[in-house]
Amino acid sequence: MRALVIVDVQNDFCEGGSLAVEGGAATAGAISRFLAAEGGSYAHVVASRDYHVDPGAHFSDQPDFSTSWPPHCVAGTAGAEFHPDFDTSRVEMVFSTGAHAPA
């Protein structure tokens, strides 16, 4: 049995987000194309999302990018949503991480 775990394909980690990674949007689309072609070969497909409710000192206006970060993936914001190019229709379950602590 094989499972596929897809990690944090969220707006804040894609271009235009508060903690963007170059190529994030293209990766979201590539994952969707992969799922369309190969998703049926996995017994389970799940995803995680960084989802901060109260991250404490994890967020900073002057982050060091080691122990503190700019605000990102705040629960209930557009940045915390999955990127629109990531088709979640094959995702069985989403696991939220980082609610009250760094993920």
Each PLM stretch: what is its role?
Residues 1-4:
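Extreme N-terminal starter segment of soluble prokaryotic enzymes
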Residues 10-16:
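Short acidic, Gly/Ser-rich segments with clustered Asp/Glu that frequently serve as metal-coordination loops
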Residues 17-24, 71:
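Short glycine-enriched, charge-decorated loop/helix-capping segments at active-site entrances
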Residues 29-103:
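Active-site alpha/beta core segments
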